[in-house]
Every structure is written in C-alpha cells, then in structure tokens.
C-alpha cells in the first residue's frame, strides 16, 4: 500500500522496480520520508518525478532539480536504464520550460511592440483617409463634378509620401487662361486645407 501511496500514476512501472531492488537494503521508514520531501535524494525516481512535477507546474528550481538528480543518480546505482531515461526526460522538461518562457517573451514582444511603436504611423495612415473621407463628404458640389469629373487617386487615397505637396498638380504646365483648370486647382486646394470649404464658397460667390 505504501508503494501505491508514494508512486504517481506515471511511475507505476518504475516505482515497483525500485522497491523490489532496494527494499531489502533500505529500511521502511525512509519510504514516506522520500515521498513526502521532494528534496531528499535517497529515492531517485520518486524525488525526480516530484521535482519534474514541480518544475512543469511552476517553472522554478532548474539548477536545484539538476543537482538533486545528479545526487540521486550517484546514490542509486542499481538501476541504469531508468536513470538514463529520467535525466533525458528532465532535460526535455527543462528545454520545454525554457522554450515555453521564450515563447511567452516572444509573444509579449509581438503583442506590445507592434502596438506601441507604429502607433504614430497608424495614426498618420488614419489621418490621410480621414481627409479623403472629408473630401468625399464635401463633394456635394454638383457643377464641379460636371466640369472636371472625379478627383485624382492621389488625393483620395493619399498613400504616396509627396501626396500633400503640389508637385502632382503640374503648375508649370497648366494653362491659367482656361477656366476649367483653375476650377480644378481651386477644388483640389480646397480639399488640401481644412478651412478651404468656407474660403472656396466665399470666393465662388
């Protein structure tokens, strides 16, 4: 019954083999002490599994767990195969714990960094379509639609870096004698400025 109490469900195969091999050499009072205290290196399998369980849950005590496993490997020399499988499993747990923690930090970097740093860029990108939306909302000037048609895409989308400049208007090539070109220029300048709506309405009347 003590073997059932001491052993974990995972260690059903390893615990009876340790008790069979070391029960004549070790007295009985050591079994509950080893099972109750995970730091005692007398029983390698039970203490090793308890340390693994603690590390898997709380991710603490990697060095102490390794030292205890080394001491347990020195103390219990009768069984070689479980001794080789346990440190391998322990190293797998250690690697999985480290990779899990690194994954957590990477996920934190993915979560916080893209939202903090490019917030200005996102705001800048949001600002340009908002001006485009204002342009679309302020389009109820029907005669100007009939004169020159829809606005150019660089004004509506605003994705280029030089979209706010007046280079795309081709001022040097424009004929000021034609009234339609001046109206197009005035209409485009209206939507480049915020207070152009009132100014353009005042100049038009």
From Swiss-Prot:
<dbReference type="Pfam" id="PF15435">
    <property type="entry name" value="UNC119_bdg"/>
</dbReference>
<comment type="function">
    <text>May play a role in immune regulation through regulation of the macrophage function. May also play a role in trafficking of proteins via its interaction with unc119 family cargo adapters. May play a role in ciliary membrane localization.</text>
</comment>
<dbReference type="GO" id="GO:0050728">
    <property type="term" value="P:negative regulation of inflammatory response"/>
</dbReference>
<comment type="similarity">
    <text>Belongs to the UNC119-binding protein family.</text>
</comment>
<dbReference type="GO" id="GO:0060271">
    <property type="term" value="P:cilium assembly"/>
</dbReference>
<keyword id="KW-0966">Cell projection</keyword>
<feature type="compositionally biased region" description="Polar residues">
    <location>
        <begin position="8"/>
        <end position="25"/>
    </location>
</feature>
<protein>
    <recommendedName>
        <fullName>Macrophage immunometabolism regulator</fullName>
    </recommendedName>
</protein>
<dbReference type="GO" id="GO:0035869">
    <property type="term" value="C:ciliary transition zone"/>
</dbReference>
<dbReference type="GO" id="GO:0006954">
    <property type="term" value="P:inflammatory response"/>
</dbReference>
<keyword id="KW-0653">Protein transport</keyword>
<keyword id="KW-0395">Inflammatory response</keyword>
<dbReference type="GO" id="GO:0015031">
    <property type="term" value="P:protein transport"/>
</dbReference>
<keyword id="KW-0969">Cilium</keyword>
<keyword id="KW-0813">Transport</keyword>
<dbReference type="GO" id="GO:0005737">
    <property type="term" value="C:cytoplasm"/>
</dbReference>
<comment type="subunit">
    <text>Interacts with unc119 family proteins; interaction preferentially takes place when unc119 proteins are unliganded with myristoylated proteins.</text>
</comment>
<keyword id="KW-0963">Cytoplasm</keyword>
<dbReference type="InterPro" id="IPR029219">
    <property type="entry name" value="UNC119-bd"/>
</dbReference>
<keyword id="KW-0970">Cilium biogenesis/degradation</keyword>
<feature type="region of interest" description="Disordered">
    <location>
        <begin position="1"/>
        <end position="40"/>
    </location>
</feature>
